[in-house]
Amino acid sequence: MNSVRTADVKRTTKETEVEVSVNLDGSGRAKVDTGLPFFDHLLHQFAFHGRIDVEIKARGDLEVDDHHTVEDVGICLGKALNEALGDREGIRRIAWALVPMDEALVECAVDISGRPYFVLKGYRPRRNRIGSPPLSTENVSHFWKSFCDHAGVTMHVVVRWWDNDHHAIEAMFKAVGRALGAAKEIVGDGVPSTKGTLRRG
């Protein structure tokens, strides 16, 4: 079992420069600067509700679009989670959360299985963008898919009810944080799998 569950990931391309640090046994502190204020706010919610300490610094070609920045933050955060989880010994592995935010109600179930898969049901954005510089609402699902692909996590998110895009998306990040926060908790000994491993590949 890993005594310290932390990781640092860097990614540099012609489109972005991203640095991510995570501590899975933190208190939910976050220091985030992506150049997208609403995205920063969402990542703070994820960290706080997951009790994961997170530092994220990203610089991307926002003059083109927010897509590359959002995607690469998802890639790096997923890689960092995957690395910090180590051998997965003793984790709860499977967990879920149901989170209300005013009229919005969002459910998330996760399995730290080593098999990446992402499903989002019940949400079709009404607003194209939120914030300034704006986060494209269509990129929210792309962020979580990128995250799951590199974290080795299966995640199902169901937006049961919503009227306001901000509320639906924020409740989504809170629900994911709470579900992952519970799934990564150490609750026993050994790898919670009949295969004996939860690593990818």
Curated annotation (Swiss-Prot):
Keywords: Amino-acid biosynthesis, Cytoplasm, Histidine biosynthesis, Lyase
PROSITE patterns assigned: IGP_DEHYDRATASE_1 (PS00954), IGP_DEHYDRATASE_2 (PS00955)
Top EC group: lyase
Catalyzed reactions per annotation: D-erythro-1-(imidazol-4-yl)glycerol 3-phosphate = 3-(imidazol-4-yl)-2-oxopropyl phosphate + H2O
Annotated localization: Cytoplasm
InterPro entries: IGPD_sf, ImidazoleglycerolP_deHydtase, ImidazoleglycerP_deHydtase_CS, Ribosomal_Su5_D2-typ_SF
Pathway of action: Amino-acid biosynthesis; L-histidine biosynthesis; L-histidine from 5-phospho-alpha-D-ribose 1-diphosphate: step 6/9
Keyword Transcription set for record: no
Recorded GO CC terms: cytoplasm
GO MF term set: imidazoleglycerol-phosphate dehydratase activity
Keyword S-adenosyl-L-methionine found: no
EC number: 4.2.1.19
Domain of life (superkingdom): Archaea
BP GO annotations: L-histidine biosynthetic process
Similarity section: Belongs to the imidazoleglycerol-phosphate dehydratase family.
Name the UniProt record assigns to this protein: Imidazoleglycerol-phosphate dehydratase
Organism annotation: Methanopyrus kandleri (strain AV19 / DSM 6324 / JCM 9639 / NBRC 100938)
